[in-house]
């Protein structure tokens, strides 16, 4: 089995099966286990494949910066508001410690990275949520950063792309967290009133208050295959309505079938799809 770890031949499989009891034998960072099919792959080769599993095609989460790198021209990204970090407005116990722990783990100050970049020479504003930080939960700083990049796009007449990945509102900030739903939606309404494009790219998972606000109101709503998208949890809904839900309920494919998404896009087609949309938008704006 261990020969397969070091055999780089293209004719060999790029993964091996490792039992749960043997996971500790795999050096940290060198190998990555697919959360879906449990196959073990070289982290470097997986990254080159945009974190798409070679075996089952599962779309493993990308970091915010890796996502931006995958959709933009090299060296064109300029980050905004990098130093903004959450306070503890409600004096919630241990909240500061949890924030600091996630900052050390991820290298981020918040659960979203915002800025401007170019794709095939076209400038756009972008916000990418990173679920490694507080599960991408929506707090006051996340809402403020998103509003600021939207306002920048509106003022400079730029299209805006937002990649969502979130467990919902951040409970440690209470009503202040919930206020971000309305706050971001108002900024997006102003952007729309200016006749500007907003692309919502919903990734796995996007739930709770994020799915009920800015993630669902794009001019064009896109998602990745099998992404979990919903408000309340499956069990909560089943217990509330006392009915069994379809197996594919709250998946991107289910939402596409029911008209809540415009397209489900494989990650390898993500950059080309966004480029085509931006080009069409530019042509419409030029001819208007």
UniProtKB/Swiss-Prot annotation:
The EC number(s) this enzyme carries: 2.1.3.15
Top-rank EC class of the record's enzyme: transferase
Task: Cite the source lineage.
Answer: Bacteria, Bacillati, Bacillota, Bacilli, Bacillales
Q: Where are the zinc fingers (C4-type)?
A: 34-56
Compartment annotation: Cytoplasm
Its recorded reaction(s) are:
N(6)-carboxybiotinyl-L-lysyl-[protein] + acetyl-CoA = N(6)-biotinyl-L-lysyl-[protein] + malonyl-CoA
Q: How is the cofactor bound?
A: Binds 1 zinc ion per subunit.
Q: What is this protein called?
A: Acetyl-coenzyme A carboxylase carboxyl transferase subunit beta
Q: Which organism is it from?
A: Staphylococcus saprophyticus subsp. saprophyticus (strain ATCC 15305 / DSM 20229 / NCIMB 8711 / NCTC 7292 / S-41)
Supply the SUPFAM superfamilies for this chain.
Answer: ClpP/crotonase
Q: Which PANTHER family match?
A: ACETYL-COENZYME A CARBOXYLASE CARBOXYL TRANSFERASE SUBUNIT BETA, CHLOROPLASTIC (PTHR42995:SF5)
Keyword entries, A-Z? ATP-binding, Cytoplasm, Fatty acid biosynthesis, Fatty acid metabolism, Lipid biosynthesis, Lipid metabolism, Metal-binding, Nucleotide-binding, Transferase, Zinc, Zinc-finger
């Amino acid at each position: 089995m261990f020969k397969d770890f070091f055999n780089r031949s293209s004719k060999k499989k790029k993964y091996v099966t490792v039992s749960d009891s043997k996971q500790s034998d795999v050096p940290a960072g060198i190998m990555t286990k697919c959360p879906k099919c449990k196959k073990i792959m070289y982290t470097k080769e997986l990254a080159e494949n945009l974190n798409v599993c070679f075996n089952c095609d599962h779309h493993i989460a990308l970091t915010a910066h890796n996502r931006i790198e995958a959709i933009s021209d090299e060296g064109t990204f300029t980050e905004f508001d990098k130093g903004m970090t959450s306070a503890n407005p409600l004096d919630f116990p241990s909240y500061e410690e949890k924030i600091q722990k996630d900052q050390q783990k991820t290298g981020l100050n918040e659960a979203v990275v915002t800025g401007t970049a170019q794709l095939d020479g076209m400038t756009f504003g972008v916000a990418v949520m990173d679920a490694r930080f507080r599960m991408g939960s929506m707090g006051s700083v996340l809402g403020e950063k998103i509003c600021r990049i939207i306002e920048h796009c509106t003022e400079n007449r730029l299209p805006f792309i937002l990649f969502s990945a979130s467990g919902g509102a951040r409970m440690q900030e209470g009503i202040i967290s919930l206020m971000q739903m309305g706050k971001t939606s108002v900024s997006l309404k102003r952007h729309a009133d200016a006749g500007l494009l907003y692309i919502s790219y919903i990734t796995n998972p996007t739930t709770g208050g994020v799915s009920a606000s800015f993630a669902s109101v794009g001019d064009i709503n896109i998602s990745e295959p099998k992404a979990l998208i919903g408000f309340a949890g499956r069990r909560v809904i089943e217990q509330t309505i006392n009915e069994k839900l379809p197996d594919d309920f709250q998946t991107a494919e289910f939402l596409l079938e029911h008209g809540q998404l415009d397209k489900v896009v494989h990650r390898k087609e993500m950059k080309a799809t966004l480029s085509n949309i931006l080009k069409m938008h530019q042509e419409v704006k030029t001819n208007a």
